[in-house]
Design a protein with these regions (language model features):
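C-terminal cap/substrate-recognition subdomain and adjoining C-terminal extension
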Residues: 88-111, 115-283
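Short, basic/aromatic recognition patches
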Residues: 1-2, 191
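Alpha-helical substrate-recognition element adjacent to the catalytic core
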Residues: 2-142, 238
């Protein structure tokens, strides 16, 4: 490590950064379906076939497009991302947080860990702000048609990507380096320098992981899911809860900035402590 303080913000996507499931904005309407009907069909199929829910919805996307003769390509999904509606303040959030980090001498990095589709996220207005996007994704044949899940990110699988960010092993095909032993002081982003933002039960594995290893977990809410988020706080599964408002000066921004400030101080103190130990040990 070069001594640079890196703070990583890890985001769920649907209902955390945008107002609803990303498929609801453009993809499902292109099928002539209501979102409620699509998700009921996908979930019923998954339960009937005892299938992972993420694989079930990805299969249902392919099947419905074939049935209705709707083109389904990487580019058509990217175009769906252009219709995503974000919560207030999201458009300027990343630049503001980055500038704040720079003032503190902190390198802030943003990551997505989502059960939604990478192709749709890639087409969204904020895709360029993320160092890496971990989300479900299709593999396409030579004609450009999706034929297999390239990556399926369910709720518990999300934790794998927290470890990847911790070690700096971002390539999902590199399991050897990910699973190799690595000294804590060689890990690129300590867990104590991570903030996870999510919206509910699907984020609990990552939120619990943050709290277990010294990171911070924040749940954001809309009116509909506020009771569930308040329950997460009562149960000690998250550190803070806020309305899904990323505007300048809102409570969420103020708290995230204070957390980053504290992480920067703690990192510098830890570096000083280890430097003194090395000096007295003659190493």
């Amino acid at each position: 490590m070069d001594g640079t303080t890196i703070v990583a913000l890890l985001y769920d996507f649907d209902r955390t950064l945008c107002t609803q499931d990303m498929q609801n904005y453009a993809f499902i309407p292109s099928l002539g379906m209501d979102p409620e009907d699509f998700w009921r069909e996908a979930n019923d199929f998954g339960r009937r076939e005892h299938m992972d829910g993420i694989l079930a919805y990805m299969y249902t996307m392919i099947r419905k497009c074939r049935e209705k003769r709707v083109p389904l390509t990487r580019e058509s999904l990217r175009r769906c991302g252009e219709s995503i509606v974000f919560f207030p303040g999201v458009d300027g959030w990343f630049d503001r947080i980055d500038r704040f980090g720079t003032l503190l001498g902190v390198q802030v990095e943003h990551y997505v860990i989502s059960s939604g589709l990478r192709e749709i996220i890639d087409g969204s207005a904020i895709a360029g702000h993320f160092k890496e996007i971990y989300a479900s994704e299709f593999y396409y044949d030579g004609a450009g048609w999706p034929v297999w899940p390239k990556l399926a990110v369910n709720f518990t699988a999300k934790t794998q990507f927290v470890y990847r960010i911790n070690k700096g092993v971002l390539d999902v095909s590199d399991d050897r380096t990910l699973n190799a032993s690595m000294p804590d002081d060689s890990k690129r982003v300590p867990f104590t320098n991570m903030i996870y933002l999510g919206d509910g039960l699907s984020d609990v594995p990552c939120m619990k992981m943050m709290r277990a290893y010294g990171g911070q977990a924040i749940a954001v809410y809309q009116d509909a899911n506020r009771p569930g988020v308040e329950q997460l706080l009562r149960q000690g599964r998250v550190d803070y809860i806020y309305p899904a408002d990323y505007s300048e000066g809102a409570g969420l921004e103020l708290t995230v900035k204070e957390i980053i400030r504290r992480m920067a101080v703690n990192h510098r103190l830890s570096e000083e402590k280890h430097a003194q130990l090395r000096a007295v040990q003659g190493t």
